[in-house]
Design a protein with these regions (language model features):
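Core catalytic alpha/beta fold that binds nucleotide/phospho-ligands
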Residues: 1-127
């Protein structure tokens, strides 16, 4: 059963400006260590960061917490599986909050066009 649904829209240009201004510090504040490995291999860093930001926002909206209430931006992450599908990761703190709320695993779908990234996330109830 569905626990919650979240969406987010991000302008890639906005994330590009933050990346240009703050550089590695921005990357370290936004990405989990596992995500930084994938980031280092990207040719379009602003697009990658915008997709991660939108996906994280959508997941915390699906949790019903937003950023705060024990879940911060580095408590949620994503790694692409063998087919390129983003798999949701939680830090131990993020997983503890999701468990306390009764949320199980999550799904996210991402797309980008015309300088925008759109993320839709679904959190499932814990079985």
């Amino acid at each position: 059963m569905i626990f919650g649904i979240g969406t987010d829209v991000v302008r890639i240009e906005r994330i590009a400006a933050a990346y240009e201004r703050f550089g590695a510090h921005f990357v370290e504040r936004l990405l989990l260590p596992q995500e930084r490995e994938a980031f280092d291999a990207r040719r379009r860093p602003a697009r990658f960061l915008a997709m991660r930001f939108a996906a994280k926002e959508a997941i915390v909206k699906a949790l019903g917490t937003g950023f705060g209430h024990g879940v911060w931006i580095r408590d949620v992450g994503f790694l692409a599986n063998a087919w390129g599908r983003p798999e949701v990761l939680f830090s131990p703190r993020g997983r503890a909050v999701a468990d306390r709320l009764g949320a199980g695993h999550g799904h996210v779908s991402l797309t980008d066009d015309a300088g925008l990234v759109i993320a839709v996330a679904v959190m499932m109830k814990k079985a």
